[in-house]
Amino acid sequence: MERAYEHGMDALALTDHGSANGLSYQLLHAKKMKAEGKNFKPIYGVEAYFVPSVADWRKEYDEAKLDKKRAKTLSDKKNEGSFINDEGSDRSSKRSLSRRRHLVLLAASQKGLDNIFQLISTSYDEEYFYRYPRMDFDLLRKHSEGVICLSACMSGVLAAAYWQHREESDEAVLVAMRELAAEFKDIFGDRFY
């Protein structure tokens, strides 16, 4: 924050991945700066982990778990002379289960900060947590008031559309990005960037 101030900035968003652990330090340092006569605004938020639908993910997870059990059963039968390779239990299926994208959420108001705290807290619940605290469209829809949403970085939601569709065509990339952007616009309105 000091460095930003020294370079002429009067505000800065600092976000942690999946939590708001640094927020208290940001708040305390902003108070210190104010006491020193430095007019500086901390912007509170989180760089969240996002999956489009936790319910859909849960179905995929349950299917992968079942496929793994089937593969084990089939593997045990291998010694009896028959074996079927089950592709559902391969590494790519595991990667898709742990896949998540980044999404930056910033508080535009006290209500927005309260909603960000609620989103973070819920993302750690058993229903949403899988290796990382995750949020989906349904959860964001419930707690979007006062929240600004940014599409984030190269691991962000729009970048994901590029990485997933780049080998199909430029048009496929644009269609996927437009669909995602429309969903976020529906939730956040003009607070999605």
Regions found by a protein language model. Name each.
Residues M1-Y193:
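Phosphodiester-processing cores and adjacent nucleic acid-binding clamps
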